[in-house]
Amino acid sequence: MKIAIFNNDAKNSQMITQSLVASLEKNGLTIDNQHPDIVITVGGDGTLLGAFQHYVDQIDTIRFVGLHTGHLGFYTDWLSTELANLVSSLTHDNGQRVSYPLLDMTVVHESGEQYHFLALNEAAIKQPVGTLVADIYLGGQLFERFRGDGIAVATPTGSTAYNKANGGAVLHPKLSAIQMSEIASINNRVFRTLGSPLVVPKGEEIIVKPKSNHFLVMYDQSEIKGRHINELRFRVADKQVHFAAYRHVDFWQRVHRAFINDIES
C-alpha cells in the first residue's frame, strides 16, 4: 500500500511527520506522494482541506486519514500520541472507508468557457466593497434577487463551518444535499429575500448570476476573482470524498466535541 503524507509548516507537525515516515517504512509501508492509496494529513482541518485540493484529481482512488497535532479537529480521528495505533491500523488495512458528499461548482464565463471545481467544505461569493447583487435560480426558474454581503453554499460536512455562522442548519452527511445560506442580506420594504437557508437535494442546481464583475469566489481555501463571470452553478457532485474508517468517529460526536461542552449528569 502506498501512503502520502501532507503536513503543515508547524515545527511540531514536521517532527511528527518524520517520526511517522520512519515508523511506516519500518513496517514495510511505501511512501509515495505522487500516486498514493492513502493520504495522511498532519496538522488540522485546514491541512486536510489543502490535501483534498492537492489530490482532487485522484479523489476516486484515495482515502484520507487525519492526524491532528493539536486538539482533535472536525475531520481528524487521530492524535499525535497515537502514531503506533495508526501505523498498526494501516498495516492491517482491508479497504474500509466512509464517504461524504462533495460540492460541484461550475464557473461560466461570458465567453462561454466553463470550469469545474470540487469543494469539501463550501464555496462563497462575496463582494469586498459595496453590496453584492445577484439573481438566484432554483429549478431553472428565477427565485429571488439577492442583495447583501454574499452567499455561501456548503456540503453537509461543511455545514458546521461558514454555513453555521450564517445561521444555517447542520446537515448529516448521509443526506446527499447542499445548503445555501445568506451573508448579511438586505431585507426591507423595497428589497426582499427568503431570509432562510435553503437545502437542495442531489439532482437539482443552484444558479447564481451576479450583476457586477467585482466579486470574489472562494472554495475551501482557494479564491477566484469574479472577472467576466456570467454565472455560477452549484450542485451535489457525482464524486465523493473517502476516509479510511479504522475507527471512524460518528458525525454527531464530531459536532458535539467541536461545539458543545461536556454535560454534567
Curated annotation (Swiss-Prot):
GO MF terms held by the record: ATP binding; metal ion binding; NAD binding; NAD+ kinase activity
The reaction(s) this protein catalyses: NAD(+) + ATP = ADP + NADP(+) + H(+)
Single GO cellular component term: cytoplasm
Cofactor names: a divalent metal cation
InterPro entries linked to this entry: ATP-NAD_kinase_N, ATP-NAD_kinase_PpnK-typ_C, NAD/diacylglycerol_kinase_sf, NADK
Compartments reported by the entry: Cytoplasm
Alphabetical GO biological process terms: NAD metabolic process; NADP biosynthetic process
The EC number(s) this enzyme carries: 2.7.1.23
Keyword list, A-Z: ATP-binding, Cytoplasm, Kinase, NAD, NADP, Nucleotide-binding, Transferase
Keyword NADP: yes
Main localization of the protein described in the UniProt heading: cytoplasm
Keyword check for Cytoplasm: yes
Residues forming the catalytic site: 45
Binding site for NAD(+): 45-46, 121-122, 147, 149, 184, 221
Similarity comment text for this entry: Belongs to the NAD kinase family.
Name assigned to this protein: NAD kinase
Source species taxonomy: Bacteria, Bacillati, Bacillota, Bacilli, Lactobacillales
